[in-house]
């Protein structure tokens, strides 16, 4: 074979290198994290056990009585206090008694029955009603008027006119003299004049008599 001559290498001048201005470069970074799934456990609720409050109450009382020398008057004092964790109470009581002054109301109350018993005299006034006695005495007037037919009897007693004019309330002649006219009408019987009879009666307040 033929061996070729080695090629002669020629070097050309390297062109000049020109650099242009670098453009503005903006950088943006994006970070993407993987989603995290976290599940919280349930919250445990704790209940405290109830506790008892021990708050005792403290009480105190005081009483004093002061009497006089004779014991008629007395002054009593009474006080009481109660204290607790939530309240405080105080009470005071003072009383004054005097037994000597209690006798005055007794005297006043005793006078009231005396006045009330005085009203019992009212029936005494009502018993004074003697008016019916006077009215019953007026009943004798019809007796006198009913014997007006006995005029002949009056004429025979002319001598006793003063006696008959004062009181003629004689009841006995009424029976004897009144029967004569009744018999005379039924039969013709002649009668002699009646005997002279005189009766006198009087009735007044506290006195009554007749003959």
Swiss-Prot record:
Highest taxon of the source?
Eukaryota
By its UniProt entry, which InterPro entries does this protein fall under?
Answer: Cuticle_C1
UniProt keyword Repeat, yes or no: yes
Single GO molecular function: structural constituent of cuticle
Pfam families (alphabetical): Cuticle_3
Q: Note the segments forming the sequence repeats.
A: 13-16, 21-24, 33-36, 111-114, 179-182
Q: Which PANTHER family match?
A: LARVAL/PUPAL CUTICLE PROTEIN H1C-LIKE PROTEIN-RELATED, MIP24391P
Q: What does this protein do?
A: Component of the cuticle of the pupa of Tenebrio molitor.
Domains: entry comment: The tetrapeptide (A-A-P-[AV]) repeats found throughout the protein are also present in many proteins constituting the protective envelope of other species.
Q: Mind telling me what this protein is named?
A: Pupal cuticle protein G1A
